[in-house]
Design a protein with these regions (language model features):
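A metal-dependent hydrolase metal-coordination microenvironment
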Residues: 2-127, 131, 138-140, 145-147, ...
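Catalytic cores of secreted or luminal carbohydrate-active enzymes
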Residues: 183, 191-206
Length: 206
């Protein structure tokens, strides 16, 4: 029988979550509590991506835990009665937190506005990921209008638990079939407690 390795045989692999929220925005746990919780579950890397709040929690870093600095931005579309009927959420994660420059966090749902924000964020030192398009009421063909995303959330466990809308395989398939490049990631989008869903990273950024 031939042994097949799902993970790289001779490389270091880190367990990471690239999307979570603390009491700095609408999360239920402090940044310190999140660190303790994720470390207890075997995580090495945690991206703090609070809504419209960019902070680098450098003091939380230690030999076995790396906090990533980031934030989540949203772009909203409302109907005539001011009800939200479509949104686009993106995560910006700093490559070098000491050099990255955040931009304004809120915007309207227009393709050119979103693409411009992604472009500026990349120029300012961030990788930019598209969050939970199914939950955001974005169809697979709609995401093809966007450019510059480093990755798409293939799965978001918070959206699955709350609205059964966390799976985004069709969006990623459409993305690849259109010739666009991007990684697939899974995240728990934690607002309260950790779901044991590892994201295994060979390298954080390319």
């Amino acid at each position: 029988m031939t042994r097949e390795y799902i993970l790289p045989e001779n490389e270091t692999v880190y367990k990471a979550n690239l999307h979570c929220h603390s009491t700095c925005s609408d999360g239920a746990m402090s940044t310190e509590e999140l660190k303790a919780l994720y470390k207890s579950k075997g995580y090495n890397v945690l991206a703090y991506t609070d809504h419209h709040t960019y902070r680098y929690h450098k003091d939380l870093a230690d030999e076995t835990f790396l906090p990533l600095a980031g934030y989540e931005l949203n772009f909203d579309k409302f109907d005539s009665k001011r009800r939200l009927n479509k949104t686009c959420h993106i995560n910006a994660i700093a490559i070098d937190p000491d050099k990255a420059i955040p931009i304004e966090g809120k915007g309207i749902y227009k393709v050119d506005v979103i693409n411009d924000a992604v472009k500026r964020l990349r120029e300012n030192g961030f990788v930019v990921n598209l969050n939970h398009p199914s939950w955001s009421n974005q169809g697979p063909e709609e995401v093809l209008q966007f450019d510059g995303f480093t990755a798409i959330e293939l799965y978001n466990s918070c959206c699955t638990r709350t609205y059964n809308s966390g799976e985004n395989q069709s969006h990623y398939d459409a993305w690849l079939k259109a010739g666009k490049k991007g990684f697939a990631i899974a995240a728990d989008d934690n607002h309260a407690s950790c779901n044991e869903l590892p994201v295994l990273c060979r390298r954080l950024f390319s």
